[in-house]
Design a protein with these regions (language model features):
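Transmembrane signal-anchor hairpin modules in multi-pass inner-membrane enzymes, especially those
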Residues: 1-82, 89-128, 178-189, 218-244, ...
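Alpha-helical transmembrane segments of multi-pass inner-membrane proteins
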Residues: 8-24, 42-54, 77-85, 92-110, ...
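Interfacial juxtamembrane loops and adjacent helix segments
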Residues: 145-151, 292-335
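Flexible juxtamembrane loops connecting transmembrane helices in multi-pass membrane enzymes
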Residues: 153-154, 213-217, 233-236, 245-286, ...
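Structural motif corresponding to the intra-repeat A-B loop/turn of tetratricopeptide repeats
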Residues: 454, 488, 521, 555-557
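Single-residue signature of alpha-solenoid repeat helices
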Residues: 460, 494, 527, 560-563
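TPR alpha-solenoid repeat register
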Residues: 477, 510-511, 544, 580
Length: 596
């Protein structure tokens, strides 16, 4: 076989498998829709890095331009490492994943420079994954395929319609670009992809994805069919109509935003509250940030402080929650990596779009733009699928066709690029070895959850202890471990585990569990303090008031006035959703009051 053909076969296979990351779903793992994709990415990266290493050893040397995008990525990665809380180590898996992404970026930059045909090939495969997702969604809507969420019929290979719609919105402008740029077969394929996505996208009911799709597709159409010259010509001919036209467009955009806001008003109000609280939290950590994985704890703390002021409204308290993500990637990066990290990340995205325009890669630039818009009101960068898509699209944007290098770019000499690629490939192998046991760990946790959900706590308690060191960064695991400890009478140990979970998550159930264990041990003052803190963070939840009522009814801690106040809250506050649990709590509180 011709050596070049072998290179192309190996690299195209590796790239295709990486682009298929969003389609992976491993049911035997806990959170297999995310962890399964991450494990797949690491496995394929091992193959891909070995292939690139083989290519670089057997191919004539190719000089690579070191661009501002490469430098910005390295600076942002350095910022993540510097701000990370190594003592707590809240996101070890994400750190390894980020390391692989950086390596992937530079390996991809090399092969796109060496083989210009991969620019189009990878975009084609990316569009194909979007088409597969769209058809998958159609099958789910018609009941021919199972959804991954009990409340939604449409999820594709994701766990809810939000990220699914976001991924389609990222692929859509790339498909439109193909339909506009090429002829015959490729144009037909592009329109088929666009049509399939447009059929499914409205059903996802994701306003963020709709906005991303409209902005990115509008830009791609303008870049391919209109451009600056035609725009300037139209402007010169219709100068007097420019201001009225802009005013009309602004009014239409405002009406569209208002309509989207009214579509899911409570959801929109909840996100506005998240952004406000996150903004206040950023003001408390403007330079150093909280570090990767520090968002949930910092958010919960700031929300408690905010609700303690007169500025907070009753409506905000009603829609409040304790989210894992900020539903705005820029705010979350600003909180976790500081304002400096946010500026660097924004510059990195901007540089991709800039180079994409300069290199006439409007499809890839449109995909990056769609992801950037979607990230304003969602959480795409918390999922591996979007990072893989971003790296592919970004690398295609910044890599100029062929091996020519502009004088303004720093060129990595052919003498040292073999060493650099070799070191990157070796680093990728090392990162794979670091995480290779995670698949079995999550598989075992999945089995343990089955036993746990059947309430066989004693049977599985030792298994949770065995996996503690490997999964102590997962608050869900720590909560389950603490529940097993609590049910087997090990309350002090359960509290120790939950205190760590509290630093990793804003989930109020963790605080409630700490309070229940402290009450069992007779630490009534600490129990009261924990519950009052939980109420401060989420003042409209009924459960902490119910726990307070039971606490104040304890003979050793009986306080009649506080008992009546807590009971009154349980009986009078309106829950978000009526349920059997609410009715049972109210009945029990009534009995407690009658006895006292």
């Amino acid at each position: 076989m011709n050596l070049k053909l072998l290179h192309i076969f190996l690299l195209s296979t590796g790239g295709t498998l990486l682009l298929c990351t969003p389609l992976i779903h491993t049911t035997e793992l806990v959170n297999g829709l995310v962890i399964g994709k991450m494990c797949w990415f690491h496995l394929v990266m091992l193959f891909f890095s070995v292939c690139v290493f083989f290519v670089v050893l057997t191919k004539r040397t190719t000089a690579i331009a070191f661009l501002s995008s490469d430098l910005l990525l390295l600076i942002f990665t350095g910022t993540v490492l510097i701000t990370y809380k190594w003592s707590l180590n809240p996101e070890p898996e994400k750190l390894i994943f980020i390391g692989q992404l950086v390596i992937f970026w530079f390996l991809l930059r090399y092969i796109l420079t060496a083989y210009r045909e991969f620019n189009f090939f990878f975009l084609f495969v990316g569009i194909l994954t979007g088409l597969v997702e769209a058809v998958w969604g159609m099958q789910q809507l018609h009941g021919h395929a199972y959804s991954n969420h009990s409340l939604f019929r449409l999820t594709g290979s994701f766990f809810n319609p939000g990220p699914y719609s976001g991924y389609l919105a990222v692929v859509l402008p790339v498909g439109l670009w193909m339909a506009l740029r090429f002829q015959k077969g490729m144009r037909c394929f592009g329109y088929i992809c666009v049509g399939a996505i447009l059929i499914v996208l409205p059903a996802g009911m994701s306003r963020s994805a709709w906005m991303a799709a409209v902005v990115a597709c509008g830009w791609v159409y303008w870049a391919e069919r209109i451009g600056w010259e035609k725009t300037k010509a139209v402007y010169r001919r219709n100068k007097n109509a420019t201001i009225p036209f802009i005013a009309i467009v602004a009014i239409l955009v405002g009406c569209a935003i208002a309509e989207l806001y009214g579509l899911k008003r409570d959801s929109a109000d909840g996100r506005l509250l998240m952004w406000k609280v996150t903004g206040k939290a950023i003001a408390g950590h403007p330079v150093t940030g909280t570090g990767l994985g520090g968002f949930p704890e910092a958010y919960a703390e700031m929300q408690g402080q905010y609700f303690g002021t007169e500025e907070a409204t009753d409506k905000e308290k009603l829609v409040a929650g304790c989210p894992e993500y900020a539903f705005n990637e820029y705010l979350q990066i600003g909180l976790e990596q500081g304002i400096g990290g946010l500026i660097v990340f924004g510059a990195w995205l901007g540089s991709m779009v800039y180079y994409g325009i300069r290199n006439r890669q409007h499809g890839a630039a449109g995909g990056v733009l769609a992801l950037a818009v979607f990230a304003v009101s969602s959480y795409p960068l918390q999922l591996p699928s979007f990072w893989v898509a971003l790296v592919f699209l970004g690398a295609i944007c910044v890599t100029k066709d062929g091996t020519q290098i502009r004088s303004s770019a720093l060129s990595v000499s052919s003498a040292c690029h073999i060493t650099i690629i070799s070191l990157l490939s070796l680093a990728s192998v090392c990162l794979f070895i670091l995480q290779k046991g995670q698949y079995e760990v999550y598989k075992r946790w999945g089995w343990m959850q089955t036993v746990y959900n059947n309430k066989a706590y004693e049977s599985v308690s030792e298994d949770y202890k065995d996996l503690h060191d490997k999964l102590k960064h997962k608050p869900e695991f720590l909560f389950e471990e603490a529940q097993c400890l609590s049910k087997t009478g090990q309350h002090a140990e359960a509290i120790r585990v939950l205190e760590r979970a509290k630093r990793l998550s804003g989930d109020p159930m963790i605080r409630y569990m700490i309070a229940k264990n402290r009450q069992t041990l007779g630490d009534y003052r600490e129990t009261e303090e924990e519950l009052l803190q939980a109420i401060g963070i989420l003042p409209e939840r009924l459960y902490p008031y119910y726990l307070l009522a039971k606490l104040y009814a304890e003979p050793e801690f009986y306080q009649a006035d506080k008992l009546r106040a807590a009971a009154g809250a349980v009986l009078t506050k309106e829950p978000k959703v009526e349920s059997t649990a609410i009715r049972e709590m109210r009945e029990e509180v009534k009995k407690i009051i009658e006895k006292k």
